Amino acid sequence: MPEHAWRIDRIMEIDDALLARVNHDWPEEPWVLEQAQIFVANPDNLLLLATTPDLICGIVLAHRLQRLDGLRAEVLLYSIDVDEAVQRQGIGRALVDATSAWARELGADNTWVLTERSNASAMALYRAAGGTDDIPDVAMFTFSNG
């Protein structure tokens, strides 16, 4: 008998059926097939899905960032989401752990993530997963390229 009712898989290919399932279970920001296929075709990108037989219950998007200094590479855990109905069941922690395992496979020196301090769930998850809150005064700027 499995330990959990969910599993985590790295997605290397996306077809219409998977896209429809993702967009059904996570309708807030619908994915576009061509963009999703480009994302997963790049070996420096990671897409993890946590699934039950009926639901995509968690998603990770991460990127390998090559360094020019003494560090070999870093992994940016760009996005992690767990469906509210299944939070606090270890899915978020397992997704962070799977991302860290991928980073180790790549030889990355560390993995990092940004979040708002007001996001109590994320702060608790990252602490529980062994993350260190080591940059207290960070600002993020966005530049439009259009």
Descriptions of predicted regions:
Residues 3-72, 78, 96-97:
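Acetyl-CoA-dependent GNAT
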Residues 10, 56-57, 93, 102-105, ...:
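Hydrophobic/basic alpha-helical segments enriched in Actinobacteria
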Residues 77, 111-115:
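Conserved hydrophobic beta-strand within the GNAT/NAT acetyltransferase core sheet
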Residues 83, 116:
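Residue-level recognition of the GNAT/N-acetyltransferase active site
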Residues 86, 90-98:
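Conserved acetyl-CoA pyrophosphate-binding loop and the N-cap/start of the following alpha-helix
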Residues 93, 105, 109, 117-136:
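Conserved active-site alpha-helix within GNAT-family acetyltransferase domains
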Residues 138-146:
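Terminal substrate-recognition subdomain of acyl/acetyltransferases
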